[in-house]
Regions:
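Short hydrophobic targeting helices and cationic amphipathic motifs
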Residues: 3-6, 16, 20, 24
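Intrinsically disordered, low-complexity sequence elements enriched in Ser/Thr/Gly/Pro
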Residues: 13-14, 42
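Intrinsically disordered, low-complexity regulatory regions
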Residues: 23-210
Length: 210
């Protein structure tokens, strides 16, 4: 028993030295909520500025078109990760912000009735955006309760892969007319994409300041 305890203590100290047990600390979860809100604020600011420039032209997009836009963005991120260089100016960070915002667009489109007007005023758009990000924050808190800060042990490239996996699931669900037998539906997958993209932005922000 003493040997087991000693081994566990040794592993614990080794992990702490590599900052690998950070996710177990309650203070870390508070930090995550703060970081989530900061990243969400950046996404919201861009979202509303584009709404001011273009209105709600995105309302014309059918669900599959939004999914394809998300897929293209995620594929570009993976391509840059694998090649290590990029030739187009748009940064990886901007693509992750795009993943957040397009996923919110998808959730808004799923929520609005078919007879909703194409043109929505900025105030209404801001209200809908805030509602969905708050729901994602609640989802994050619930998952952090169960999993701790395990996402902090993930590589950003793994988050990219999980986003692509979610998008492939969404494409299949859409091809099945939105029906699933035992799996999560469209909303749950879009919400997971938002949170993984936010996590990636947090990790990238931290690496840029180290």
């Amino acid at each position: 028993m003493n040997l087991l305890f000693s081994a566990a203590l040794t592993i614990s100290k080794a992990c702490q030295a590599q900052n690998q047990l950070f996710y177990l600390c309650p203070a870390s979860m508070e930090k995550t909520l703060e970081q989530f809100r900061l990243v969400a604020g950046r996404c919201r600011d861009l979202f509303l500025k584009k709404t001011a420039d273009y209105g709600t032209a995105w309302r014309i997009l059918r669900p599959a078109s939004i999914t394809d836009q998300l897929y293209i963005k995620a594929l570009r991120i993976r391509s840059i990760e694998e090649k290590g260089v990029q030739k187009v100016a748009d940064s990886v960070e901007s693509e992750f912000i795009g993943l957040v915002n397009y996923s919110v667009l998808a959730l808004i489109q799923l929520e609005l009735p078919e007879d909703a007007p194409l043109d929505l005023d900025t105030g209404r758009v801001a209200e809908l955006f805030d509602q969905h990000l708050e729901e994602n924050l609640r989802l994050l808190q619930s998952k952090n309760h169960d999993y701790g800060e395990a996402w902090r042990l993930m590589r950003v490239s793994s988050m990219t892969d999980l986003i692509l996996q979610k998008l492939l699931r969404i494409k299949q669900i859409e091809d099945n007319a939105g029906q699933t037998l035992v799996s999560e539906g469209l909303e749950a997958n879009f919400r997971d994409i938002i949170n993984y993209a936010v996590f990636a932005l947090i990790r990238l922000g931290e690496s840029n300041t180290e």
